[in-house]
Amino acid sequence: MAIERTFSIIKPNAVAKNVIGSIFARFEAAGFKIVGTKMLHLTVEQARGFYAEHDGKPFFDGLVEFMTSGPIVVSVLEGENAVQRHRDLLGATNPANALAGTLRADYADSLTENGTHGSDSVESAAREIAYFFGEGEVCPRTR
């Protein structure tokens, strides 16, 4: 298996629940290395830019409003088959369909406020990482 990087967001509703540490512990227990992370409060412009592929869809404005409603934690995770394994750990986008023990089953409040985001492909991960992390902000872990 190839070592990949994927991008993760702990969304405002999960940050408000004080479960950042619990989510990080689950990332590490699943074998991911956290190679970059920071907390920030998105501006409307940042949220619209990040979710630009959804512009014009009925849920877009509500998504932007939610994602700017409080701080988020963005992270870069590294590991074998990281994109798919991270998505498996997150669970279904709609928490009503998320399997027990997944992050969305445990921390989501609704389809919009589903607690977490994860890249859906290696290409998306690279684009999303570059959106939030500059050169030198992601640190390879050699130990």
From Swiss-Prot:
The keyword Metal-binding applies. It comes from the Bacteria. Its EC number is 2.7.4.6. The active site is at residue 117. Major role in the synthesis of nucleoside triphosphates other than ATP. The ATP gamma phosphate is transferred to the NDP beta phosphate via a ping-pong mechanism, using a phosphorylated active-site intermediate. It is found in: Cytoplasm. NCBIfam families: PRK00668.1. Its cofactor is Mg(2+). SMART domains: NDK. One of its GO terms (biological process) is CTP biosynthetic process. This is Nucleoside diphosphate kinase. One of its GO terms (molecular function) is ATP binding. GO terms for cellular component: cytoplasm.
